[in-house]
């Protein structure tokens, strides 16, 4: 059976129905995880910071260059090397995403001695920035989550009904995330990080007002410090995400520290 990634609806991002299920065989997850790199020109000093891009569902590592993200970063003349991970849905479906990203992409790159590691991802990749950071808090300096998928609507409605993330009565921490608990655990972790109760990266969020995920993303926005959310007119698409990336590259701790 051939399954088109782009034909899968956004609801398929509900990993609770995909992790460790038979349907995972429809979504490839090659080992090692493939990646594409863009390094500083040889004439420049060694880059201080590493950016790891994580694609959305149906996208691939090369899209970050093809759709202008790499050029946008280069335009700002930052001390940055970039690598895009081909972190497709199959890795999430098999629950191997954090391990493969660490082993195949992040650790080999970090061996070069970067001072900071930043993750940038959209939609499924936005979730990935948080999913990975929860288990690697000491390694990740910060993230830019663009229109991240943050679980099913019923959960975000529950959080909203309780007054938002700050007042939500979340579950106890779990040691191992799986398809049954990852959504609540991500939100619980976000609550703990934004309260200063657990270590975590410097979180930045960007999304368009007309994005299909805006109602859940605004719950996270309300819990972040001032200046850590970029909100513009736009939808769930690369055009909007590229503008949001530009805002982040102009005004963020990343922009200030990776020069």
Features from the language model and the residues they span:
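Residue-level signal for mature regions of secreted extracellular proteins and peptides
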Residues: 16-17
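Non-catalytic cap/lid and distal C-terminal segments of serine-dependent acyl enzymes
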Residues: 24-259
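C-terminal motif of bacterial Sec signal peptides marking the signal peptidase cleavage site
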Residues: 20-22
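Bacterial N-terminal signal peptides that target proteins for export
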Residues: 2-12
């Amino acid at each position: 059976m051939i399954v088109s990634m782009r034909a899968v609806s956004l609801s398929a991002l509900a990993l609770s129905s995909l992790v460790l299920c038979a349907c995972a065989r429809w979504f490839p997850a090659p080992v090692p995880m493939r990646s594409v790199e863009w390094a500083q020109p040889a004439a420049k000093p060694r880059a201080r910071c590493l950016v790891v891009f994580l694609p959305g569902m149906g996208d691939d590592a090369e899209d970050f260059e093809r759709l202008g993200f790499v050029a946008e970063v280069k335009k700002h003349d930052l001390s940055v090397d970039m690598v895009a991970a081909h972190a497709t849905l199959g890795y999430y479906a098999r629950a191997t995403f954090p391990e493969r990203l660490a082993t195949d992409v992040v650790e080999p790159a970090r061996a070069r001695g970067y001072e900071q590691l930043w993750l940038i991802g959209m939609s499924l990749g936005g979730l990935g920035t948080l999913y990975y950071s929860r288990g690697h808090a000491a390694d990740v300096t910060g993230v830019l989550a663009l229109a991240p998928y943050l679980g099913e609507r019923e959960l975000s409605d529950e959080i909203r009904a309780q007054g938002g993330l700050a007042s939500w009565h979340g579950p106890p921490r779990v040691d191992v995330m799986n398809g049954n608990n990852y959504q609540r655990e991500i939100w619980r972790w976000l609550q703990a990080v934004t309260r200063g109760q657990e270590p975590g990266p410097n979180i930045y969020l960007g999304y368009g007002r007309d994005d299909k995920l805006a109602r859940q993303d605004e719950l996270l926005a309300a819990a972040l410090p001032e200046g850590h959310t970029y909100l513009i007119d736009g939808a769930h698409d690369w055009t909007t995400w590229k503008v949001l990336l530009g805002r982040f590259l102009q005004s963020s701790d990343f922009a200030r520290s990776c020069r």
